[in-house]
Amino acid sequence: MTYSRNIFIPLTRACRNRCGYCTFRSDTPEPPLLEPEDVMGEVRRALSLGCTEALFTFGEDAHEFPGVRDKLESLGFGDMTDYTYHLCELTLDAGLLPHTNMGVIGYRELRMLKEVNASMGLMLESASPRLMETEAHRESPGKNPRLRIKMIEDAGRLRIPFTTGLLIGIGETIEERAESLLELRRIQDRYGHIQEIIIQNFRSKPGIPMENQREPSLLEMVKMVAAAKIMFPDVSIQVPPNLNRETGEIFLLAGADDWGGVSPISRDYVNPEAPWPEIDELKRITESAGFALEERLPVYRKFISREFLSPRVMERIEELYPRFIETL
């Protein structure tokens, strides 16, 4: 059972999507954008606590918001991709390995960011276009599954180690859940770059449009984890531990083999009501189910090679984290 010791750095809460289950986005984020000195202060703090991963997550097409655009221009950047590249570059030089999830972006942006990222990510959430007509995604053009599937495929063409996953309980049917797994299996069979699939349960929060939506049951989640593991024996299956503190052991027995990024320094800004468990607590939960807990990097060991990583990232891993490299 693995985990990555990380810091979560939300560069901005501005986002073009208005998902019915989200508390992260803001029309007027304050500050509109984290500045480099703030980011690097967090990076240095993370390094002092033994973190290896910097998770850069922020709203999709954030540079379309006037406040963000003005701040980018004042810093000398044209858009969020250019700015993220710069921050990833600084972070990599400092000794943390970047993992970026900035919503749907194109092939050119992916190719650019691969140079300074150990891995990247985008949740598929669901392959069902029907959800675009529901409260979950009615006001979220970036949640169109066609766009998200294309980005995951583009990452495969570029040989980027990739994390994706499904969001369970946002109005999808059992059949649509199965179709979503089959879509990811099709992509993986063609490109082989998916390192991890997250099976994440919807959690109701006060004040969101979907506040009264029923959360998925434990049995539903167990079935999804088991189905994912059967369909993806070559991919790690993650269940977020902070969203399932009381039931974590059950998911291990169902086939989950990764806890994802766990931070000793930052909260989960997407689910602020659910703090990360301490590493010692994760160890206890894991061992109580009969498994050992092992730390990993944001790129899984089998993807640590020049086939999947840029020379720049590979050299940093060889220099700083040789113990994580697969030895033959």
UniProtKB/Swiss-Prot annotation:
KW NADP (keyword) present: no
Catalytic activity: 5-amino-5-(4-hydroxybenzyl)-6-(D-ribitylimino)-5,6-dihydrouracil + S-adenosyl-L-methionine = 7,8-didemethyl-8-hydroxy-5-deazariboflavin + 5'-deoxyadenosine + L-methionine + NH4(+) + H(+)
Residues binding [4Fe-4S] cluster: 15, 19, 22
Enzyme class: lyase
Positions in coiled-coil regions: none
GO terms of biological process kind: sulfur compound biosynthetic process; water-soluble vitamin biosynthetic process
GO terms assigned for molecular function: 4 iron, 4 sulfur cluster binding; 7,8-didemethyl-8-hydroxy-5-deazariboflavin synthase activity; iron ion binding; transferase activity, transferring alkyl or aryl (other than methyl) groups
Superkingdom assignment: Archaea
Pfam families, per the entry: Radical_SAM
Assembly, per entry: Consists of two subunits, CofG and CofH.
Protein name stated in the entry: 7,8-didemethyl-8-hydroxy-5-deazariboflavin synthase
Protein's organism: Methanothermobacter thermautotrophicus (strain ATCC 29096 / DSM 1053 / JCM 10044 / NBRC 100330 / Delta H) (Methanobacterium thermoautotrophicum)
Gene for this chain: cofG
